Design a protein with these regions (language model features):
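Residue-level signal for glycine
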Residues: 304-306
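Active-site flanking residues adjacent to catalytic metal/cofactor-binding acidic residues
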Residues: 40-41, 73-74, 158, 204, ...
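Residue-level marker for buried hydrophobic side chains located in beta-strands
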Residues: 36-38, 69-71, 109, 202, ...
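N-terminal active-site segment of His-dependent metallophosphoesterases
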Residues: 19-88
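Short acidic, glycine-rich surface-loop motifs adjacent to enzyme active sites
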Residues: 195-211
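Extended active-site neighborhood of metal-dependent phosphoesterases/phosphodiesterases
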Residues: 30, 77-199, 215-221, 225-237, ...
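Bacterial Sec-dependent N-terminal signal peptides
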Residues: 1-22
Length: 314
């Protein structure tokens, strides 16, 4: 029996090695932690590194028993989807993220600006057809238990295009101006205020702070509308996408850590600005591990390398 057990154990370790071999710096996360990945700016029919990064995500999810994936907007470039039967679903999502480890966990989704070129309602309705796709509303919150402890983590998923005047004034984002952004801001505020959870994490598509060539009004609108709430209500992190590179920022005088997840396909150059702790232009995804005492995140690029690791202590 002992010999049989050793054979089984050796086989299990060998399979784990194979699953992690493309990850240049694989790190085994605590099994008792809440472990998840962040993906954003994804769907390009597998090109621009998307298919390769999807493979890496599958290996990471299998290697570390990931609990879920948070999608920080723009899952379907360039024009979102027109309906739940749009062929874009298969071409840019279903046929790309095919690893078993990615099929059997929930994907919690928020829309980005590209979804507003199509039907945001279809993004929500697809939740009724897909076992893994979770978009119950334009903005929503979930609680996740940290391992088997009584400690919980609050995730607040928000809808950022309506918070930015640039999109509200552009007819090509016709659904944005119809949204009551002040109602959403009141909801974000009350959700954070009423939470006694150990960690409070807000996830949206557009950054509050970031280096980018995109219009500065995007960040100033986010700072005056969302940033104040995040700081006043003591959110621990704000995680976003949109800029297509990795950034970690904590401007002077701010208590929130601002994380920009890179694109899971096509990336862009980046420079350091005031408040930058780290930046990297490569495409990839973010791996996160939450315990009672620490929130640790890893930026993993398209080569499978961990280009940055940072821990926030409670």
């Amino acid at each position: 029996m002992k010999k049989l057990f050793n054979i089984f154990l050796s086989f299990f370790l060998f399979v784990s090695f194979l699953n992690a071999q493309d990850l240049v710096t694989p790190e085994k996360l605590p099994a008792k932690a809440l472990n998840f990945m962040v993906a954003s700016d994804m769907g390009r029919r597998g090109v621009s590194e998307q298919a390769h990064i999807a493979t890496l995500m599958g290996k990471e999810a299998d290697f570390n028993m990931i609990d879920f994936i948070a999608v920080a907007g723009d899952p379907i470039h360039d024009n979102g989807v027109k309906s739940t039967s749009d062929s874009e679903w298969k071409d840019k999502y279903e046929n790309i993220y095919t690893a078993t480890s990615l099929m059997n966990i929930p994907w919690y989704v928020v829309s980005g600006n590209h979804e507003y070129h199509g039907s945001v309602q279809a993004i929500l309705d697809y939740s009724k057809l897909s076992v893994r796709w979770k978009a119950p509303a334009r903005y929503y919150s979930i609680e996740k238990r940290i391992g088997k402890t009584r400690n919980k983590c609050l995730f607040v998923f928000i809808d950022t295009p309506p918070l930015i005047d640039k999109y509200r004034a552009d007819n090509s984002y016709s659904d944005a101006f119809k949204q009551d952004f002040e109602k959403q801001l009141r909801w974000i505020d009350s959700t954070l205020v009423s939470s006694n959870d150990r960690w409070k994490i807000v996830i949206g598509h557009h950054p509050v702070y970031a280096d980018t060539e995109k219009a500065i009004t995007e960040r100033t609108d986010m700072q005056k509308r969302l940033g104040t709430i995040l700081e006043n209500r003591k959110a621990d992190l704000y995680i976003c996408g949109h800029i297509h590179n990795f950034q970690h920022l904590k401007p002077e005088g701010k208590t929130v850590n601002y994380i920009v997840n890179s694109s899971a396909s096509e990336s862009r150059k980046v420079n350091r600005i005031e408040g930058t702790l780290f930046c990297n232009p490569n495409p990839g995804f973010t791996l996160c591990s939450v315990t009672k005492a620490y929130f640790t995140f890893f930026f993993i690029d398209h080569t499978g390398s961990t280009v940055y690791k940072y821990s926030i202590k409670k």
